[in-house]
Structure formats: structure tokens, C-alpha cells
């Protein structure tokens, strides 16, 4: 079966976090951590 796994975390959860305000602050920290 073909499974496309681009990220180790589920993308469905990411969409929920995008609506949260904390997600915006987390995204900036992730860029510095990555």
C-alpha cells in the first residue's frame, strides 16, 4: 500500500492548533528550534 508520511505528527492535529493562538507562538519557536 502507498502511505505518504511527510511528517511524524498527524496533520489533522496541526489544523486544530492553527486555529489556536498558542499555535502562532509555537510556530515561531519551532522555526528557531529547527
Swiss-Prot record:
GO biological process terms on file: cell differentiation; chromosome condensation; spermatogenesis
Superkingdom classification of source: Eukaryota
GO cellular component: nucleosome; nucleus
GO molecular function, one term: DNA binding
Protein name: Protamine-Z1/Z2
UniProt tissue specificity: Testis.
Subcellular location: Nucleus; Chromosome
Keywords annotated in UniProt: Chromosome, Developmental protein, Differentiation, DNA condensation, DNA-binding, Nucleosome core, Nucleus, Spermatogenesis
Ranges where the record places region Disordered: 1-34
Main location: nucleus
Function noted in UniProt: Protamines substitute for histones in the chromatin of sperm during the haploid phase of spermatogenesis. They compact sperm DNA into a highly condensed, stable and inactive complex.
Further details from the record: The sardaine Z1 sequence is shown.
Outcome recorded upon mutating residue 7 to A: In protamine-Z2
Amino acid at each position: 500500500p502507498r502511505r505518504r508520511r511527510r511528517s511524524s505528527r498527524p496533520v489533522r492535529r496541526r489544523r486544530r492548533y492553527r486555529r489556536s493562538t498558542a499555535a502562532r507562538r509555537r510556530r515561531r519557536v519551532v522555526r528557531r528550534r529547527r
